[in-house]
Curated annotation (Swiss-Prot):
This is Zinc finger protein mex-6. The modification Phosphothreonine is found at residue 190. InterPro entries: ZFP36-like, Znf_CCCH, Znf_CCCH_sf. Pfam families: zf-CCCH. Residues 1-35, 163-209, 425-451 are annotated as: Disordered. A zinc finger (C3H1-type) spans 273-302, 317-347.
Amino acid sequence: MTATSNSAPLAGGSLSSSATAQPPQPPPGHQQQHPLPQIYDSQMQYYYGSSMPNQPIPTYTAQNGAPQQFGTPPYYQDANGQFGQVPAQQQMMTAGHPYFYMAQPQQGGQHVAQSGQPQIFYYQQPLGQMAQQAAPMYFHPMQAASTPMLSEQMSMMPQIQSTNPQQSEQLRKSGAQISTTRTVPLTSSTPLPTSREYETVQRDRNRNSQSRYQCPIEHDDLPIDEISKITIDNHNDDTMSAEKENRFNKNRVEKLGRRGFAKPEVDSQLPHNFKTRLCMTHAAGINPCALGARCKFAHGLKELRASDIPTRYPNNKYKTKLCKNFARGGSGVCPYGLRCEFVHPSDTEFQNIPPYQRKMVEEHDSIPEDYVVARYQPRFMHTSGKATTPTKVTLKQRNVAGSMMCLSNTGRDLEAGGDFNHPEINENDLPPHLRRIRRGNPPVTRSRPSFSTKWTSVENLGLRGHY
């Protein structure tokens, strides 16, 4: 059995005859088991496996808890003819494999110069599953450098050498590695890495790949000091919000003190109107306030505080005009509610506004009429949220009534004033600009023409009009 030792050596002490026990001399004639001439590289080092009898060391030892069994530490013979024991941490031969790698022997920090001829490699006891061979194993160096050989391919190498070209072609189709070039011993010009060096290379490669593509860090990979800085932000919690607000005020006071300003009290940092009015959402009691402790309005009488600043300058026009949302064309709903500065129908100031504004509210709340045959149509049509009852008038009656209305002068009033231009309307109920018009041009009472027919009568049509 053959082996090569071209892997990188591990750091260790010198392997000399004085440091290790000298094994007995190998049996004579062991080197004469190679009758055929071989091709060797003068820069490489070769080892032949053989057993050393009468050694009480066990045949196999398990390393690193691996299920496979490895051979016991062997001895080697240097150029001076001295025997040295291979360290136990070196990679051992696996039972059933045709070769293994070993580090070159060292003396201190220097490699031991070996001759180009093969060296005999002695085992303390024979390995049962390893059959001895008279000649070293041959393989192509490019195959070992390009792809690693599996254990099944390694065991097939002795069989491949004895096959003919036809069998080699069949094995090549099955996936076996076969070399048709000149064979050389199991050597390599580059030392093979050890297990520790291989792990170091893999670790560096993984580090480079992560720095290039910047893989995300899992939560388990975060340092402990960074995990301690992670906090839970319950912004909806009243207690947490109050603590955060107090901490913010405290930090603000400290920053002002470091900049040379006088440190004001914490209460002076709050707005002057903070918690001076009740929160309408909280006072309604329907839904809780979403702001919680961060709300600037008072949640109850306990939080309500008196303001130290004087009240604002009074607004002389406060609650003196009707809100446009309740006038003609309005929606009937004010989004400002009690905060609106205009008069609502539910306010006590509603009785203080002019009568014409109150009439606009009454018209807004009244049910709209069908003005098809009415005498006076309103200038501003509006819609209401209330459902109207349709007037039961047939299409024939509408057409006849419309044609008769065109013959009379009672269809509509074309003069200025609209609905307010009637003699029976009180002057106090008119807007200011219409009052001035009425004083200059009083309304003229019109008489109904004599040829008015029954089709203009509201009683016959079932309608109500302003006559």
